[in-house]
Amino acid sequence: MNSWTEAIGEEKVQPYFQQLLQQVYQARASGKIIYPPQHEVFSAFALTDFKAVKVVILGQDPYHGPNQAHGLAFSVKPSVVPPPSLVNIYKELAQDIAGFQVPSHGYLIDWAKQGVLLLNTVLTVQQGMAHSHATLGWEIFTDKVIAQLNDHRENLVFLLWGSHAQKKGQFINRSRHCVLTAPHPSPLSAHRGFFGCQHFSKANAYLQSKGIATINWQLPLVV
């Protein structure tokens, strides 16, 4: 199994998925502002192919402010100030990775291109309404994505931050993959153990131990 088409192509023709897409389409057509824009909903899959995935970082649902979400978990468009959770991710990187310099932006596309699947478990949201699309069926779809990675890839690193991601990843085969857990990087919980978790260096140490090229976590300082 080499591509997302092979991995989840059949899922996209399931009735629940067609109904889900129709609900999102109707919401947009009725004038509601839905993030991310339609052409970016599946960006995580377009940028990181199935056979290229090395690390999976699970988010929850997209940012719900203007111009933030573009289809990659935790990432924002280049012109947007990094949100608090991403600021805390950068703080941990600066502690964990020698020489890491905090960029001026929150655009994580360089990670995606190296094999970091930045996957939200719900792929759309209505402006200003967190979790507004949580019951549409996205969770069924992203469960399938994780199951296919679990079953048809090996030696992946899953970074599960917060209880939602940890529950979502509870069935991942720990003998086949590396699963690292920590509190969410949100300001509400980062001090409970996200800071100091060293997940970025641990991910690279695991990849290296399996003979897999590591991730360069350093992002361009400006974009």
Curated annotation (Swiss-Prot):
GO BP annotation list:
base-excision repair, AP site formation via deaminated base removal
Recite the lineage of the species: Bacteria, Pseudomonadati, Pseudomonadota, Gammaproteobacteria, Pasteurellales
Protein name per UniProt: Uracil-DNA glycosylase
Q: Which family is this protein grouped under?
A: Belongs to the uracil-DNA glycosylase (UDG) superfamily. UNG family.
- Active-site residues, record numbering mapped to chain: 61
Compartments in which it is found: Cytoplasm
HAMAP family recorded: UDG
Q: Which InterPro entries match?
A: UDG_fam1, Ura-DNA_Glyclase_AS, Uracil-DNA_glycosylase-like, Uracil-DNA_glycosylase-like_sf
What is the protein's known function?
A: Excises uracil residues from the DNA which can arise as a result of misincorporation of dUMP residues by DNA polymerase or due to deamination of cytosine.
**SUPFAM superfamilies attached to this UniProt entry:** Uracil-DNA glycosylase-like (SSF52141)
Q: What is its main location?
A: cytoplasm
Taking the record's annotation, the residue ranges forming a coiled coil are none
**Which EC number(s) does the record attach to this protein?**
3.2.2.27
* GO MF assignments: uracil DNA N-glycosylase activity
Q: Which UniProt keywords apply?
A: Cytoplasm, DNA damage, DNA repair, Hydrolase
**Matches recorded under Pfam families:** UDG
Reactions catalysed: Hydrolyzes single-stranded DNA or mismatched double-stranded DNA and polynucleotides, releasing free uracil
